[in-house]
């Protein structure tokens, strides 16, 4: 109990320590550029965007569900907070435009900004797994048990969840040699050591990355690629910068090998 209390106080200290970077969460790029999560033209219609905005505030969105077919290579996208099915699809579409991937859903359903933030605290500070995390865990587990190459791309809170999933897989002595994990702006305070491939991408002026992967670099398994950028949005602040190869030592990234030659 004392350890949990100390860990909670440490997380509060870290959150306050980096508050200076909170205003940079939306970066300084054109927020309404093509593929932006904030651009109405990125959605099928205005209603989809308004529903996404509503869901990010108060939740009640249905989880994005699609029949998942186990293939020889399975690529899953695990989103962060305030992401309903419309935003998930927008992110997945941009991932597919950059990489030779057919992305399948590992949808972390939004319950609204406050409940989502509380989930981050419970998951990261107290290492509590909720029902949804277990569901995501079994999806990854099934792919690995069938000896299929399994790639997980995680953003923000998704970094916390995939760290929890990997810890559970390690506890169950699951062979992780076919697992690859790529996180963007991970909010986690760790990534467990194991027999799998892992990479992390972080912007120096992204508040979430600063209180997560950048603050706890020594606790992270896998290479960390750092970009001198602002912003936390996956599409315009991370994937677009990845397209421009503007992360440190990017030539050492295995994820780079999946990029389409025409991008």
Task: Map each language-model feature to its residues.
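Serine-dependent carboxylesterase/thioesterase catalytic core
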Residues: 131-215
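Short beta-strand-to-loop junctions in surface cap/lid or active-site-entrance loops
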Residues: 58-72
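Active-site catalytic motif of lipid deacylating hydrolases and related acyltransferases
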Residues: 2-53, 71-148, 205-213, 232, ...
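Lipolytic serine-hydrolase domain surface
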Residues: 176-180, 185-263
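Intrinsically disordered, low-complexity segments that are common in secreted/host-exposed effector
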Residues: 8, 35, 41-62, 225-229, ...
